[in-house]
């Protein structure tokens, strides 16, 4: 109410800042403070559990998965990143590092084309990216078995773009799974209500 009523300096606190902090907290508390512990029942850990289980169950078919996350994109500056955390945990469980890639690593159209080909062949089995980088134009459906929405995008069209990566012609899997991870009593519920 203080923010709405103008009782707070907008350079210190405003609805956009509150909304952004709410999204970060719903994703992982370490985004607000890297010194906080890795909450065992976080949606990041739930995602890692599902990605690993599906990876293990589909080893023989070399099925692939997409993980979408618009916040906390990969960083190489030592700060906490959800992308780095998920990859590290999957590697610790036995997924080869070469099979877990970030779309952000493909900095040119040529590199992106090569990366997409590796996903289509089952050489890369977990591809992580933001809606902007891995939405429209990402045609890797051939072996996709699961898609994971770790956060909620702002626009309904973005959620549709994400789902459109796996639910499309050319996918060899007759049945696919889409997981949406929501942290109870956080900003997640509000965001999903906005986009649906």
Please tell me what each predicted stretch does:
Residues 71-104:
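Conserved helicase motor "Helicase C" RecA-like lobe of SF1/SF2 P-loop NTPases
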Residues 25-32, 70-74, 107-108, 133-135, ...:
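Short, solvent-exposed loop/turn segments at secondary-structure junctions
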Residues 1-73:
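Interdomain linker/hinge connecting the two RecA-like lobes of the SF2 helicase core
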Residues 87, 96-131:
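Conserved helicase ATPase core of P-loop NTP-dependent helicases/translocases
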Residues 14, 39-47, 78, 82, ...:
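Soluble or luminal CAZymes and related metallo-dependent hydrolases
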Residues 23, 64-71, 99-105, 127-131, ...:
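Short beta-strand segments
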Residues 157-160, 166-196:
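A conserved SF2-helicase RecA2
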Residues 22, 75, 113-116, 127-149, ...:
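SF2 helicase motor core recognition
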């Amino acid at each position: 109410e203080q923010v709405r009523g103008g009782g707070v300096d907008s350079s210190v606190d405003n609805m956009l800042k509150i909304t952004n902090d709410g999204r970060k907290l719903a994703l992982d508390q370490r985004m607000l403070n890297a010194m906080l512990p890795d909450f065992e029942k976080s949606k990041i850990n739930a995602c890692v559990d599902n990605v690993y289980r599906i990876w293990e169950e589909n080893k023989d078919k070399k099925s692939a998965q997409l993980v979408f996350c618009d916040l906390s994109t990969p960083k190489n500056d030592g700060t906490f990143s959800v992308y780095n955390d998920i990859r590290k945990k999957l590697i610790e469980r036995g997924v080869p590092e070469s099979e877990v890639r970030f779309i952000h690593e493909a900095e040119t159209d040529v590199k992106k084309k090569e990366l997409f080909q590796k996903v289509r062949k089952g050489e890369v089995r977990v591809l992580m990216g933001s809606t902007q980088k891995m939405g429209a134009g990402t045609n890797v459906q051939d072996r996709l078995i699961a898609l994971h929405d770790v956060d909620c995008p702002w626009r309904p069209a973005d959620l549709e773009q994400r789902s459109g990566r796996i639910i499309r012609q050319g996918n060899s899997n007759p049945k696919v799974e889409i997981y949406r991870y929501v942290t109870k009593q956080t900003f997640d519920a509000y965001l999903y209500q906005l986009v649906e």
